[in-house]
């Protein structure tokens, strides 16, 4: 079973994708919060 090797490959590539997704989500959430704050004012 070569699960260890494939897992390493997936994790190294997957980590980058996950980080990018989290960054995008954080950015969108921040924009939404800023918009809400601006609308309140």
From Swiss-Prot:
Major localization class: membrane
Tissue specificity: Mostly expressed in leaves and, to a lower extent, in roots, flowers and stems.
Entry's Gene Ontology cellular component terms: plasma membrane
Alphabetized UniProt keyword annotations: Cell membrane, Developmental protein, Membrane, Transmembrane, Transmembrane helix
Signal peptide interval: none
Alphabetical list of Pfam families matching this protein: DVL (PF08137)
Annotated TM spans: 10-29
Membrane protein topology class: Single-pass membrane protein
Intrachain S-S bonds: none
GO biological process: negative regulation of cell population proliferation; shoot system development
Residue ranges of the region described as Required for DVL/RTFL small polypeptide activity: 10-41
Cell compartment(s), UniProt: Cell membrane
Taxonomy, superkingdom: Eukaryota
Cited PANTHER family: OS01G0525701 PROTEIN (PTHR47855), ROTUNDIFOLIA LIKE 8 (PTHR47855:SF6)
Functional summary from the UniProt entry: Small polypeptide acting as a regulatory molecule which coordinates cellular responses required for differentiation, growth and development, including leaves shape, pedicule elongation, inflorescence organization and fruit maturation, probably by restricting polar cell proliferation in lateral organs and coordinating socket cell recruitment and differentiation at trichome sites.
Family: Belongs to the DVL/RTFL small polypeptides family.
UniProt name for this protein: Small polypeptide DEVIL 4
Species this chain originates from: Arabidopsis thaliana
């Amino acid at each position: 079973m070569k699960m260890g090797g494939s897992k390493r490959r997936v994790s190294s590539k997957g980590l980058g994708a996950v980080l990018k997704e989290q960054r995008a989500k954080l950015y969108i959430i921040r924009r939404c919060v800023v918009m809400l704050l601006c609308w309140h004012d």
